[in-house]
Amino acid sequence: MWIENLPNGKYKYFERYRDPLTEKLKKVSVTLDKKTPRAQKVAQAELLEKIESKINNSSTSNAKFTDIAEEWWSFYKKSIKQSSISALQSSFNFIIDYFDKEIKISNVTSKVIQKFINDADCPRSKLERSKSTLNLIFDYAVDLEYIEYNPARKAKLPKKIQTVKDLEKIQNKYLEQNELKALLSELYSRPNTRRLALLAEFMSLNGCRMGEAIALKKENYKRSERKIDIHGTLDKTVGYSKGVKTTPKTASSFRTVDLSDREIEILDEIIEQNNLSKSVINDYNEMGYIFVSKRGIPLQTNSFNLAIKRANSRLKSPINKNLSSHIFRHTLISYLAENNVPLKAIVDRVGHKDGGKTTTAIYTHVTENMKSSIIDILNKKN
């Protein structure tokens, strides 16, 4: 222990100790009014008490990784939607199954995490989610002072080499305009799929997600202003018939977008159909939603996806792509990119955060293909 005189006439007592977590020397101090032998004994006792407290707090380094991971998961689930919980549960389980149940969190180094990444035998998308999950687990551990730094941040995913197959995957994420026209025409040709056709065409023009589209209510539709508020999504986990609207996927998903002439026509038609159904069907379930079945229940994603696949199978030349509701959103992105709309404007319309990986990939792919048209234009000039 040593003592320093302070300008205010008091005395500061210091003592060093070795932090068991970092193995570095640290110091603690107390300030007293006197420098007498009695005061020095008091200071010594207080310093030892402080050191003991610091060392006990450092013992959190003995905590097991899986215990902290479970603790984080219980905490994190309270801040995300049920749909996000379902999406992340598989990655979380993948991590828990890999790591030894007895390993201390302080012993999970960047090398250990890198080995987890290198050993992982799973699709790239799952590996990326698992790495993001590890980042969050260790950020939590740092915040609660279980560890001093996040080892997951230094571990790296292998650089993805883009192949011809990857480029084909991007192309398969959206429809060409002739493909869109053929599919919509088939859906419109049958009375039992007309409502689905209206929804599909609306998404191809608006760029909204299906969950956002079926969560649209009449009060969101500002016809006189030619705008619509996309301020939520339908929580499918509780059932479509309950029609529970929840917050959107991200803050950027909370948006108001302008409506084209055709979008207004679509909204007017579906609302008119709903009013007709309400007048003739006794058990019509009025929940205020726009894109609903003839009984008032929001259109279901699984039924929609099945219907467009069946419609595709009836085409003379079926589209060789994985058709789902999301393809209409991506089709708008590609169409706007082809028409030289800036990426920022597209992102704002479709409500993607930070550009959005898929949005950017489609935009880049389409604009790269457009470079070939430059030569055609220049050749025509001559």
From Swiss-Prot:
The active site is at residues 209, 242, 326, 329, 352, 363. Keywords: DNA integration, DNA recombination, DNA-binding, Viral genome integration, Virus entry into host cell. GO terms for molecular function: DNA binding. GO terms for biological process: DNA integration; DNA recombination; establishment of integrated proviral latency; symbiont entry into host cell; viral genome integration into host DNA. Residues 170-376 form the Tyr recombinase domain. Residues 63-142 form the Core-binding (CB) domain. Pfam families: Phage_int_SAM_3, Phage_integrase. Gene3D superfamilies: 1.10.150.130, Intergrase catalytic core. It comes from the Bacteria. InterPro entries: CB (IPR044068), DNA_brk_join_enz (IPR011010), Integrase-like_cat_sf (IPR013762), Integrase_catalytic (IPR002104), Integrase_recombinase_N (IPR010998), Integrase_SAM-like_N (IPR004107), Phage_Integrase (IPR050808). Belongs to the 'phage' integrase family. This is Prophage ps2 probable integrase. It comes from Lactococcus lactis subsp. lactis (strain IL1403).
